[in-house]
């Protein structure tokens, strides 16, 4: 072993002086190499799964070289699904290692289509196969040479497609006496408070400022519906929910995360998480008036969740976001 190391050192030092061929260097193990480390889920959205591929390229030479291109085919059962290329012009330092990665996306529609012939499998066998082309023109005596470093890595793709929707938005009005008390406490006369409360309970249109200076709480209920169209075992975890008065609002009007603490996980193929938020008219009065009038900008409902696949070795609680405008016309108004 010691002799081989000495011989390598001698050959490297002698490159500028002796006519050594590329094959001679390779005979002594002096050739670039690629280490394709893993394929992992990078992110999820409602369209597909984005995978991340980590790899490194080792340079055994005392001069840097560049990567002409990393190209690969994504395969399903040895049939090409898609091709990709990356890293043209990336430099690898002398006697160094370059760590890098690239991503690709597999749509849920493709996964479910492939699964039709997979006899109910919970995951599908994919592979990524390709090579890295290395430009050796900066290495003495290798000016016209290119090294090709092949790689192949298998990975499992869960058979699933998440579906998230919101249903049954409803605002629950306080009783007549509670509203009258809130209005009078806010400065209205008893007669005016009675008229305002009766008008709201009867479903009449209200002015946008009817709740100004009025301290009153109203319950706002939603159903968050979650489903998995595939056969993979999964776990959906609700992390956070919020509602904004419009899509351009900078801050959440209501934080619903605390309202669902007792029921935030779904492990079956589908399920519903009931959510209840409290709207206080001191800071949400105009929004409540919009709901009652069914007129104005639609609020935006957002969900932050985590997904995991217990039967696969992917990271737990992969983040998945969902955002949807709620038409004001879809809100129901009910009484206590």
Q: Where do the model's predicted regions map?
A:
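Terminal connector regions
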Residues: 108-160, 281-333
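C-terminal motif of bacterial Sec signal peptides marking the signal peptidase cleavage site
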Residues: 19-21
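Intrinsically disordered, low-complexity Pro/Gly/Ser/Thr-rich segments with frequent PxxP/GP/PP motifs
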Residues: 79-113, 247-286
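N-terminal beta-strand/beta-hairpin edge segment
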Residues: 39-41, 51-122, 130-132, 222, ...
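Short, solvent-exposed beta-strand/turn "edge" segments of beta-rich domains on protein surfaces
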Residues: 25, 38-50, 58-65, 91-94, ...
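Surface-exposed beta-loop interaction hotspot
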Residues: 141-201
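Solvent-exposed beta-strand/coil patches in large extracellular/periplasmic or lumenal scaffold regions
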Residues: 68-70, 174-265, 271-274
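Bacterial N-terminal signal peptides that target proteins for export
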Residues: 2-11
């Amino acid at each position: 072993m010691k002799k081989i190391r000495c011989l390598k050192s001698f050959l490297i030092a002698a490159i500028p002086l002796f006519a050594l061929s590329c094959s001679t260097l390779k005979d002594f193990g002096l050739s670039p190499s690629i280490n394709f480390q893993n394929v992992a889920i990078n992110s999820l959205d409602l369209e597909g799964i984005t995978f991340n591929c980590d790899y490194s390229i080792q340079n055994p030479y005392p001069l840097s070289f560049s990567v002409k291109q990393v190209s690969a085919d994504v395969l399903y059962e040895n049939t090409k699904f898609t091709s990709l290329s990356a890293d043209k012009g990336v430099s690898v330092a002398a006697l160094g290692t370059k760590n890098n990665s690239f991503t690709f996306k597999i749509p849920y529609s493709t996964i479910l289509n492939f699964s039709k012939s997979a006899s109910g499998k919970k995951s599908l066998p994919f592979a990524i196969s390709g090579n890295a082309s290395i430009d050796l023109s900066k290495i003495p005596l290798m000016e016209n040479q290119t090294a090709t470093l092949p790689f192949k890595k298998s990975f499992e793709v869960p058979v699933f497609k998440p579906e998230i929707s919101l249903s049954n938005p409803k605002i629950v009005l306080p009783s007549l006496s509670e509203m009258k008390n809130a209005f009078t406490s806010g400065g209205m006369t008893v007669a005016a408070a009675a008229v305002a409360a009766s008008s709201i309970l009867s479903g009449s249109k209200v002015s946008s400022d009817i709740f100004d200076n009025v301290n009153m709480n109203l319950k706002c209920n939603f159903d968050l519906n979650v489903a998995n169209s595939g056969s993979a075992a999964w776990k959906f975890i609700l992390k956070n929910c919020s509602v904004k008065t419009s899509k351009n609002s900078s801050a959440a009007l209501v934080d619903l995360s605390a309202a669902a603490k007792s029921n935030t996980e779904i492990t079956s193929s589908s399920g519903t998480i009931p959510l209840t938020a409290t709207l206080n008219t001191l800071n949400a009065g105009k929004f409540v008036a919009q709901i009652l009038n069914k007129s104005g900008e639609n609020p935006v409902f957002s969900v932050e969740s985590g997904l995991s696949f217990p039967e696969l070795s992917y990271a737990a609680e992969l983040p998945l976001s969902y955002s949807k405008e709620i038409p004001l016309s879809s809100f129901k108004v009910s009484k206590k």
